């Protein structure tokens, strides 16, 4: 009598979890469109927004200037605005671990934590400028190991074109040949810098920023000269 061996059942692929980090100072329509397009394209049930507390490239504490000399908005205000911006979309959630984490916040640390929590199919959403800067981040090659990199096209870049590979020096050289996946989305030339400048100059930002966020900015006198 022979015993027939059966192959073990294949392990199910974990559901993708999309991540969108940033200072969100303030959150705007571009963030929301980017997140929704990425969620649908990669089949993610949820996009977690990761507001930065003390980013590597920027100070995250009130009173300390960022690299461009501007005073960053307090994390409590940025978190409150983000909650208002995401309200009403059950597929959007906030993960505030980088605000709660003491000291500088690094993307690779967040990805490692999420993997340890069982989220092994991660989609990291980046802008094209962030991708170009990625080789200067902490352990860039490890970031590519932990997550699929989904890149938002620049407003003038056709969505059909292939995004560039990350390049750099040192450890960043190791990510030079790695490819990324581009997010198919409409071109939107909106940035938090633009929103802050318009508010500071008394220009309208309606339809660029959710109404609830506009009300919060006005109530708390944010971005005024």
Indicate residue ranges for each PLM-predicted region.
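Nucleotidyltransferase catalytic core that binds NTPs
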Residues: 1-164, 168, 172-225
């Amino acid at each position: 009598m022979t015993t027939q061996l059966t192959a073990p059942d294949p392990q199910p692929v974990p559901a993708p979890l999309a991540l969108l980090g940033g200072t969100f100072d303030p959150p705007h329509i571009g963030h929301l469109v980017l997140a929704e397009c990425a969620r649908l394209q990669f089949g993610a049930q949820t996009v977690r927004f990761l507001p930065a507390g003390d980013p590597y490239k920027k100070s995250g504490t009130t009173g300390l200037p960022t690299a461009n000399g501007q005073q960053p908005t307090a994390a409590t205000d940025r978190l409150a605005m983000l909650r208002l911006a995401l309200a009403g979309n059950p597929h959007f959630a906030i993960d505030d671990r980088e605000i709660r984490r003491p000291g500088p916040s690094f993307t690779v640390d967040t990805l490692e934590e999420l993997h340890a929590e069982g989220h092994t199919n991660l989609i990291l959403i980046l802008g094209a400028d962030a991708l170009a800067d990625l080789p200067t981040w902490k352990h860039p090659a490890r970031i590519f190991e932990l997550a699929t990199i989904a890149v938002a096209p620049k407003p003038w870049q056709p969505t059909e074109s292939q995004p560039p590979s990350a390049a750099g020096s040192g450890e960043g050289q190791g990510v030079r040949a790695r490819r990324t996946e581009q997010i198919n989305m409409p071109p939107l030339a909106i940035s938090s810098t633009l929103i802050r400048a318009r508010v500071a100059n008394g220009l309208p930002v309606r339809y660029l920023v959710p109404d609830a966020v506009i009300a919060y900015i006005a109530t708390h006198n944010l971005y005024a000269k």
